[in-house]
Structures are given as structure tokens and as C-alpha cells.
């Protein structure tokens, strides 16, 4: 089994030109936060992630195996809710309320995205945004203090 042990830095990514022929590993957001994980590559082979704790992979990252193989990370499509509006102040308010609930959130111009949750959908609709449930790639914002993406536990942090 191939053992991927490191993420190639940005300089290495910029110099890597064979993206069309490299191995691909397609991972959900939850899987991209795991430092130890058994995965299936696009060629059907099994591989293992053995990455430093706290590593959060993003679409486009390159992984390098102990034996030299390189794999491109792709974000898997997941069931998500995409909230949208042309009113950017309204979008900011929705992001504030979702953030207050420790919801990992992807924020883009005119829309935000989170893992589907009908209770959150109702709250966001109540604020006046449209909500579309769909299968899409999901890449939430990293933690503001350089931490990993969290929120799945819905725990409270005390500072």
C-alpha cells in the first residue's frame, strides 16, 4: 500500500506539471481533516494518509508518498446547503449567525455554503436568504487563528 506522508509545499506545487497523469484522491471535507486515513485512489489502488496531526488538505494540494508517488487532492461533492442573496449585508448577517453556531462555512461573493442541515436552512431562510440543497464541493474557511477547520462536534470554546 502506498503511504502518503507529506504535503508538497507551494513551491513544489508550482513546479509540478504532470497533473493530468498523476494519481488522484477524492476526499470529503471531513476526510481532508484526518491525519490517518485509508483511501482509494483513482486507479483503484488503496493508499494510506500518514500526515502530521492538524493537517487540513485543500483541493489542489499534492501529496507525496515515501516511495515518490504524487497524488492530487480533489474535493468530493457532498450534500450541502448553499445560501444566496444579492444583499451582501444580509449575507454577512447570515454568516454571523452561522458562525455563532460554530458552523464551518465556505464564504463567497453572494453566497455561503455549509454541510446540509434543515434546521440551519430554516434559520437562514428566516433571515431572508434563498437556500439550495445540492451536491457540490465544499471548502470552508480555515480557522481565524491558524487552527484547523472544526465545528463538527458543536462544542463550545472558552478563551
UniProtKB/Swiss-Prot annotation:
Location in or out of the cell: Cytoplasm
Keyword check for Cytoplasm, yes or no: yes
User: Which terms in the GO cellular component ontology are assigned?
Assistant: cytoplasm
Q: Does the keyword Chaperone apply?
A: yes
Pfam families found in the cross-reference section: UreE_C, UreE_N
Q: Name one GO molecular function term.
A: nickel cation binding
Keyword vocabulary terms for this entry: Chaperone, Cytoplasm, Nickel, Nickel insertion
Q: Which InterPro entries match?
A: UreE, UreE_C_dom, UreE_N, UreE_N_sf
Q: Main site of residence? A: cytoplasm
- Gene Ontology BP terms: protein folding; protein-containing complex assembly; urea metabolic process
Against NCBIfam families, the record matches this protein to:
PRK13261.1-1
Give the family from UniProt. Answer: Belongs to the UreE family.
Q: What does this protein do?
A: Involved in urease metallocenter assembly. Binds nickel. Probably functions as a nickel donor during metallocenter assembly.
| Protein known as | Urease accessory protein UreE
Q: Give the organism the record lists.
A: Vibrio parahaemolyticus
Amino acid at each position: 500500500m502506498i503511504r502518503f506522508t507529506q504535503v508538497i509545499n507551494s513551491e513544489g506545487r508550482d513546479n509540478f506539471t504532470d497533473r493530468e497523469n498523476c494519481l488522484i484522491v477524492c476526499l470529503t471535507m471531513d476526510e481532508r481533516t484526518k491525519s490517518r486515513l485509508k483511501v482509494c485512489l483513482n486507479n483503484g489502488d488503496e493508499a494510506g494518509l500518514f500526515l502530521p496531526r492538524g493537517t487540513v488538505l485543500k483541493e489542489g494540494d499534492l501529496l507525496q508518498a515515501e516511495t515518490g508517488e504524487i497524488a492530487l487532492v480533489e474535493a468530493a461533492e457532498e450534500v450541502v446547503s448553499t445560501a444566496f442573496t444579492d444583499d451582501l449585508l444580509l449575507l454577512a448577517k447570515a454568516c454571523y449567525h452561522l458562525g455563532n453556531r460554530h458552523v464551518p462555512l465556505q464564504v463567497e461573493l453572494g453566497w455561503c455554503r455549509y454541510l446540509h442541515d434543515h434546521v440551519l436552512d430554516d434559520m437562514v431562510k428566516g433571515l431572508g436568504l434563498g437556500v439550495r440543497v445540492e451536491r457540490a464541493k465544499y471548502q470552508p474557511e480555515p480557522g481565524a487563528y491558524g487552527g484547523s477547520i472544526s465545528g463538527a462536534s458543536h462544542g463550545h470554546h472558552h478563551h
